Amino acid sequence: MTAETPVKDENIVWHQHTVDKQFRAELKKQKPAVLWFTGLSGAGKSTVAGALENRLAELGYHTYLLDGDNVRHGLCSDLGFSEQDRRENIRRIGELAKLMADAGLIVLSAFISPHRAERQLVRDLLPEGEFIEVFVNASLEVCEGRDPKGLYKKARAGEIPNFTGIDSEYQAPINPEIDLPAGEKSVEELVELCLNELKQRRVIS
């Protein structure tokens, strides 16, 4: 199933609200940001993002975690896994993350998002410095060895076509804001690396 290309109407104009992004952020005592977790299936994107959200919640910050599987149950349930649908999936999530950041939230997005162009598309939606690319850096060998959902086994058997890392390319980030050595450190250590970066960027205090 393929989504139709949206058509822009010149009669539709942006309505500026009185309560703006800065006001919402000040209420929450935090700086809006979109942390975009990217990496191969099984690298630990959702695990690290979830653990980070737990820590941020404990510290009193306002967050929302967007998970690749979860959004396909609703917002992107009409999309398949063709290249066109995968691009549309990321475009929709990028727009949603932008709205959530506008609400003053710290957004954690965990998606394979294999192509640099699609990640750049999301980056370009946001003000400079608000998009934080987090590369959950684990090798194909490590991810396939974990295979928590049995997807690599199915892909190797030809049951899942166009599976990222097997018969579909994953383009690793060239210069991510955060590079997490997910094959070497514990989840707790990776969370600390993220927290330190957020403090340096004054997203949190």
UniProtKB/Swiss-Prot annotation:
Main EC class the enzyme belongs to: transferase
SUPFAM superfamilies, per database record: P-loop containing nucleoside triphosphate hydrolases
EC number: 2.7.1.25
Enzymatic reactions: adenosine 5'-phosphosulfate + ATP = 3'-phosphoadenylyl sulfate + ADP + H(+)
Active-site residues (renumbered): 113
Pathway field: Sulfur metabolism; hydrogen sulfide biosynthesis; sulfite from sulfate: step 2/3
GO molecular function: adenylylsulfate kinase activity; ATP binding
GO biological process, one term: sulfate assimilation
Residues reported to bind ATP: 39-46
Keyword Nucleotide-binding attributed: yes
Keyword set, alphabetical order: ATP-binding, Kinase, Nucleotide-binding, Phosphoprotein, Transferase
PANTHER family with a match to the protein in the record: ADENYLYL-SULFATE KINASE 1, CHLOROPLASTIC, BIFUNCTIONAL 3'-PHOSPHOADENOSINE 5'-PHOSPHOSULFATE SYNTHASE
Protein family: Belongs to the APS kinase family.
Function: Catalyzes the synthesis of activated sulfate.
Protein name as it appears in the record: Adenylyl-sulfate kinase
Source organism (scientific name): Vibrio parahaemolyticus serotype O3:K6 (strain RIMD 2210633)
Gene responsible for this protein: cysC
